[in-house]
Amino acid sequence: MKRLLVVFCVFGFSASIANEMSINGLWKTQDQRAKIEIQSCSQASQEICGVIVELREPIDPETGKEKTDKLNPDERRRGRKLLGLVNLSGFKPDADEPNHWTGGTIYSPREGKTYSCEITLTDPNTLEVRGYVGIPLFGESQIWTRTTKDEKLLPNSE
């Protein structure tokens, strides 16, 4: 009987691990303007963060220099470069829903605004990122796709 219980516990634990997909890795945004690397914020934390690691257009056409956070409401931060900028932070795994992270924020350098955000890994290569003000119902979702360093962002089609 004890063996049977151990077997059920081991298989049950293995199944719960299999249901948790890894969010860590490189993601391209829906508009393909950027690649974001998502990983743990620190080794001691379960929180995840995202950093801008590639831009389709890294040079500001007005200045001829690397793009900066020029729309940030904090004037002291307007000179920081977009490459290397943390734009996702504070996400914790949802205890009730596997592959879902809540409690975080997303920063939009295109608007200079920070929004509440939740993230759902719908399959190993698809991430639903929902930014909102107040409650998720009043938000907007984007679908991000897992990518590689070598995969190019599509040219601007606007």
Positions of PLM-derived features:
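Sec-dependent N-terminal signal peptides
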Residues: 3-14
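Edge beta-strand at a domain terminus
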Residues: 133-158
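N-terminal helix-cap/turn-to-beta initiation motif at the start of protein domains
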Residues: 17-26, 153-155
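Residue-level recognition of beta-strand termini and adjacent short loop/turns
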Residues: 123-125
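Exposed beta-sheet edge/beta-hairpin loop segments within beta-rich domains
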Residues: 117-121, 133-135
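C-terminal charged interaction modules
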Residues: 128-132
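Central antiparallel beta-sheet cores of small beta-barrel/beta-sandwich binding domains
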Residues: 24, 30-32, 36-116, 149, ...
